[in-house]
């Protein structure tokens, strides 16, 4: 599913942070979907890959970031649930990914499978799927190799290392300011109905750390998420 083509009309500005959203007109319909799974996030890059990188290396980075965004969005939803602001059950992200692996669905494959099929695999009523599009200048990351980039992405979400998170300007490029957009949707696992949709558009300074960039976007998505008590 390409959630950019679902008829959501948006006027987005090129400065700051803008968002537009759609919620199913029958709120009770949304609330009848009690269990939700957050899917790996579809990543779309419009910049150039660093010189010398293979297509496989680029794909590995995309999938690593997909899981990083998924983990962050899931965490933001759990925060809201812990504060009594989310009236729904969110499946643990580890369980979501384990179930996908067990049936042979990889990160990239999950981006395009129908919501109904994914919901059946995961045993949930609805799935939250997101598409992130951004320009990446990764030339400063090339010398570190794909393993270094992937390690940093996972390291920043390890609670045991929160005190050691530092800025990695080489991860996204030095002194670059570009735009990032995120399209999020909650989709029925029964008939594919769009229950909720939001588009967030921001101007990002890529000298910020990876976790700041990722969590800034997912925090905005979580604030717009339905099921608020």
Question: What spans do the regions from the language model cover?
Answer:
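Sec-dependent bacterial lipoprotein signal peptides
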Residues: 1-17
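C-terminal/domain-edge helix-coil "capping" segments
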Residues: 17-48, 121, 134-229
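N-terminal segment of the mature soluble domain
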Residues: 44-137, 189, 193-200
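N-terminal start-of-chain detector that recognizes signal peptides
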Residues: 9-11, 98-102, 153-159
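Hydrophobic alpha-helical segments, principally membrane-spanning helices and signal/leader peptides
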Residues: 1, 25, 108-110, 116, ...
